[in-house]
Amino acid sequence: MYYEKAVQKTINWIESHLHEQISNEDIVNVSSFSKFHFHRIFQKEVGMSVASYIRLRRLANAAAALLYTDHRIIDIALYYQFESQEAFTRTFKKMYHMPPGAYRTFMKRFTSKKEESYMEKKMKGWVLSGSHPFQFEMGIDRENVHQGKASGYLKSTMVQDIGEFATMMQQFKADRYLGKRLRLSSFIKTKGVQHFASLWMRVDSAADDVLQFDNMSNRPITGTTNWNHYAIVLDVPENSAVISFGVQLSGPGQVWMDHVVFEEVDESVPSTNLEMPGELLDEPVNLSFEEELQK
């Protein structure tokens, strides 16, 4: 958890300085770790190097600028710290498989047609659930993207109370992960979240008993936040049947998620399981409310 906070602090700083030069000394100062130690931590937590992360985020922002602004390609390239339009084009083409100019033309046509149909189609694999799902909306966003070409979002539409919540979620069989420790991670961004937003995961038995659960209730995301990295780590007991996961929004606001990753980890990675009530007692106790007074 200590390393997670250091990584989140550094990512938050990076997100605010993508249009500026970022040196190794900057990362050292923000993270408060030595260069090589923090780079190992970052690689382990996020799954890529600091340099790769910065390059990926600059490219994602540049791709959004190509679609949603009329700025010249050279201006976008220089704003995101590429040495030249040629250098930007080479790097962009490796990620998006076409040069920036062609991407701008193709994706604007593609997006305008797609947005019309997305309002009528469900998102593949994802379902909207919760206490008041009809007061929320989920969908695909091509402008607010962490990496690649799209992110998923969940936002309130008619929420009246902070206790009303919804989740954009999936479920799958636990068979493949029985007896293992599983780490779920995602990049999340929020806007105007009045109560809380969170990543969550639950492991259930065939009898629908909750075996493992974490909804980040002890570390909620609130307010307006930039893209950052969040993770949940749970064990999958041998009697597990179903794994559920998603992003949750309680009360008014909007939350985005992108680059969701599942991976097996060893026991050196701490579990984030929230302690559930223990085993049931054989009989009721302290019915007179006086047992504590007798000690």
Curated annotation (Swiss-Prot):
Q: Which InterPro entries match?
A: Homeodomain-like_sf, HTH_AraC, MarA-like
Give the UniProt entry's GO cellular component terms: cytosol
Span of domain HTH araC/xylS-type: 8-106
Indicate the residues that the entry says bind DNA: 25-46
Q: What does this protein do?
A: Probable transcriptional regulator.
**PANTHER family in the record:** ARAC-FAMILY TRANSCRIPTIONAL REGULATOR, RIGHT ORIGIN-BINDING PROTEIN
Which named protein is this? Uncharacterized HTH-type transcriptional regulator YbfP
